[in-house]
């Protein structure tokens, strides 16, 4: 008997942004799905508009599993995780142990297939960068949603993420930001009316 998927199903019980007041709580499971949507889109944009040659479906899968180890480690708040390089380095080691523990929950004949999704050492540098871009973009989108709902708790997080996005900047991310991101600050009525035109 394997407990792998029973563990993954508990990602929905782990809340993100645990030290901040949220208008709407976000869990790791729904965050992972949004990161998969965005990473998939970034890969397609890169391929279609900027001469990329990425497997968009693989990118989506990598994004789906990118935070799977948090079912064991929990979601450590960013200010703590990146407080200094030593903490960040040690946390990476903890994540690696958690990834290995998840992999060992699988039947032996499936372990390699999932190791390639759970362990970022199996990602190409381009795949890793794209998933990190999507992850940061989704955190930024969360900030926009919270701010548009009147929650000023996310002002500093938004500023920090703008710096992160500037560092991870790419043509496909610029395209996504210009075409898709503005809608996240609009109401349902505004995006619905615009869609009917």
UniProtKB/Swiss-Prot annotation:
Keyword annotations: Cytoplasm, Hydrolase, Metal-binding, Nucleotide-binding
UniProt xrefs under SMART domains: HDc
Keyword Nucleotide-binding applies: yes
Chief place where the protein resides: cytoplasm
InterPro entries according to UniProt: HD/PDEase_dom, HD_domain, YfbR, YfbR/HDDC2
Annotated positions for site Appears to be important in orienting the phosphate for catalysis: 16
Pfam families attached to this UniProt entry: YfbR-like
Signal sequence annotation: none
Subcellular location: Cytoplasm
Residues involved in substrate binding: 16-17, 31, 67, 75-78, 135
GO CC annotation, single: cytoplasm
Listed EC numbers: 3.1.3.89
Family as reported in the entry's similarity comment: Belongs to the 5DNU family.
Annotated HAMAP family: 5DNU
Family annotation (NCBIfam families): PRK03826.1 (NF003009)
Subunit structure comment from the entry: Homodimer.
Name of the molecule in the record: 5'-deoxynucleotidase YPTB2590
Species this chain originates from: Yersinia pseudotuberculosis serotype I (strain IP32953)
Taxonomic classification: Bacteria, Pseudomonadati, Pseudomonadota, Gammaproteobacteria, Enterobacterales
